[in-house]
Amino acid sequence: MSPSATDTTEVMDPTILTLRKVLTSESEPLGRRFRALFSLKHLACLQPPTEKTLPAIQAIAAAFTSPSALLKHELAYCLGQTRNPASLPFLQQVAKDTEQDTMCRHEAAEALGALGYEDSLEILKALRDNQNEPEVIRETCDIAVDRILWENSEARKAEKLKTSDFTSIDPAPPLPMTASEPSIPEIEQTLLDTSLPLFLRYRAMFALRDLASPPDLPTATRAVEALAKGLKDPSALFRHEIAFVFGQLCHPASIPSLTEALSNQSEAGMVRHEAAEALGSLGDYEGVEETLRKFLNDPEQVVRDSVIVALDMAEYEKNGEVEYALVPDAGVAAA
């Protein structure tokens, strides 16, 4: 099933049609396309699903023909958050497509793990075990397989997980709660131990994230400092996920390490772009916007695009906007 094969005439809702046109138009500013995407994501993720859910999923998938790796990777992420099997064929196709950008394929594989359906195991295992695939694809599929197996296991039912402040479906759940108070040094040790499975290390990562939110939690700064050490990990995939978590947390203690990651020209593009977007979510802190503007002409396209989106997000933060999204009014939607 081709992501571009959906028929726009099937999409009757004028709001979805308008958002789809913005999202798929290469002449629209990137920030506006991202806002359209997040509006569609809201509709695609509604639980229980409504009559707008499937058209919204199809509208998101229609933009996989874009040349923008940044946009396509965000499409995949959004589809992975839908909890809807209608997203599976689009994501499976992108994950397998070796012509697609590696960052986009990685995000599609991660999204299949987030959806948690066992139908995806065959594809993910094949990619994980294919030595011709880039390391980031193999590592992503390794984590995604473990997540799906965990999602469908009896062991999961026995685990007690801390209630998270975050509604995102993550590549791994946090470590299960124990009778004793969580020890940040112990969790940090798991986070940084490269001999352990990536899935377990990701569980430590998300456990630390949850100990860092809200930012005035007594454990928050120490948890952020522990996470920051992960930005020195040998795995680019791991480093990029640390930056993503920092974007969720919006904790000022992460600004120095994010700035260092973005400024490092030898760092992987997927890490630098995630650092840029994370800084965008911290845009109301002094000096952050100035830092981002330095990279508007970066040699790497995905970094330039991320800075554009990050500055757009920072502008929304400054203006006190409730949600980073595009809401067409009735007149525009009907146009």
UniProtKB/Swiss-Prot annotation:
Q: What is its EC number?
A: 1.14.99.29
What's the chief localization of this chain? cytoplasm
Describe where the HEAT-like PBS-type repeats fall, as residue ranges on this chain: 71-97, 104-130, 200-233, 238-264, 271-298
Q: Could you tell me what the cofactor note in this record states?
A: Binds 2 Fe(2+) ions per subunit.
Entry superkingdom: Eukaryota
Catalytic activity, reaction form: [eIF5A protein]-deoxyhypusine + AH2 + O2 = [eIF5A protein]-hypusine + A + H2O
- Sorted alphabetically, which InterPro entries does this protein's record hold? ARM-like, ARM-type_fold, Deoxyhypusine_hydroxylase, HEAT_type_2, PBS_lyase_HEAT
Q: What's in the keyword line of the UniProt record?
A: Cytoplasm, Hypusine biosynthesis, Iron, Metal-binding, Monooxygenase, Nucleus, Oxidoreductase, Repeat
What PROSITE patterns has UniProt attached to this entry?
Answer: HEAT_REPEAT
Provide GO CC annotations from the record: cytoplasm; nucleus
Q: Which cofactor does it need?
A: Fe(2+)
Q: In which pathway does it act?
A: Protein modification; eIF5A hypusination
Give yes or no: UniProt keyword Metal-binding.
yes
- Where, by residue number, does Fe cation 2 bind? 240-241, 273-274
UniProt subcellular location = Cytoplasm; Nucleus
Q: Which family, according to UniProt?
A: Belongs to the deoxyhypusine hydroxylase family.
Would you tell me the protein name for this molecule? Deoxyhypusine hydroxylase
This protein's encoding gene: lia1
